[in-house]
């Protein structure tokens, strides 16, 4: 007999072991971003959000991608189950709205809330671009303002943005104070990520010139969808280590049938009650996921002065 996550969190509350940030620590607002699709962005976003919730943090996952893969993994059929009013869309287009509270919904993971997306959110790309062309550049701060309106309730906000450099992605960059970039070790993905970084630098310079400074507490790269049986991937992994240095998460997120099988069930590996392949494959997959997510967790905690002494005691500072 085991305990539910809600019961574990109750016990953490009784024993004073909740890992929450202090009230004067900044909320970690983390974007999992790459301008190329198919790199494992949504998979990493959802598994990271659930991992943090399992650890006892208060987490908000914001699905900013109109493809709504993250929302789908929480059991929604986005264009049937969700209206445009359930997403970011009203907040991005209606200046009179001052809070994102209306769009937040609890999930079956205790401590993890979701702002979902559906295809209708894509319409806001055109509307934001048109308004910005008329000189309303401050619209890029709308998402930042919305997150600020609810951030007091959370330790971490994880954002899953669209895989494109549009108005929503720029808004995510403005809102985020940390960035995680998933990079599969293939020639196409590696080269497109290099282009993404160059474009990111150029975009941030333009924003700075317009008085919109964007500061990141950390930038990490995750080798995603890794198949080390392929010699070219092994070579590219070595190259990534040389180029990204300590910014590269040490644990690669290897390709696994457990992730694929969980996704086919509209679930994550953390939700599966048992292996869908074999026990050893499941354990290896969880080792990769926990390894990636635990490194990012340390980066998040390093943002919080209240965790300094604990990180030193744990040998993580």
Model-inferred region functions:
Residues 2-317:
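P-loop NTP-binding core
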């Amino acid at each position: 007999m085991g305990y539910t996550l809600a019961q574990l969190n109750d016990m953490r509350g009784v024993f004073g072991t909740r890992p929450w940030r202090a009230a004067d620590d900044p909320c970690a607002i983390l974007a999992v971003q790459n301008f190329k699709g198919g790199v494992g962005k949504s998979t990493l976003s959802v598994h990271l959000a659930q991992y943090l919730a399992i650890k006892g943090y208060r987490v908000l996952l914001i699905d900013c991608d109109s493809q709504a893969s993250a929302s789908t993994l929480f059991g929604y059929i986005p264009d049937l189950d969700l209206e445009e009013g359930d997403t970011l869309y009203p907040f991005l287009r209606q200046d009179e709205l001052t809070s994102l509270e209306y769009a937040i919904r609890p999930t079956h993971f205790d401590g993890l809330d979701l702002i979902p997306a559906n295809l209708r959110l894509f319409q806001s790309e055109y509307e934001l671009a048109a308004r910005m062309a008329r000189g309303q550049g401050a619209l890029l701060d709308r998402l930042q303002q919305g997150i600020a309106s609810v951030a007091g309730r959370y330790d971490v906000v994880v954002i899953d943005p669209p895989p494109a450099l549009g108005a929503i992605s720029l808004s995510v960059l403005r809102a985020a104070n940390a960035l995680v970039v998933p990079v599969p070790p293939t020639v196409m993905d590696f080269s497109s990520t290099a282009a993404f970084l160059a474009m990111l630098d150029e975009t941030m310079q333009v924003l700075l010139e317009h008085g919109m400074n964007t500061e990141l507490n950390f930038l990490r790269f995750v080798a995603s969808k890794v198949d080390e049986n392929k010699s070219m991937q092994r070579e590219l992994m070595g190259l990534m280590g040389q180029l990204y240095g300590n910014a590269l998460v040490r644990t690669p997120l290897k390709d696994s049938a457990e992730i694929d099988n969980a996704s086919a069930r509209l679930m994550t590996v953390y939700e599966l009650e048992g292996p869908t392949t074999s026990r050893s494959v499941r354990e290896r997959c969880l080792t990769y996921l926990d390894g990636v997510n635990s490194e990012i967790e340390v980066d998040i905690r390093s943002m919080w002065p209240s965790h300094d002494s604990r990180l030193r005691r744990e040998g993580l500072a």
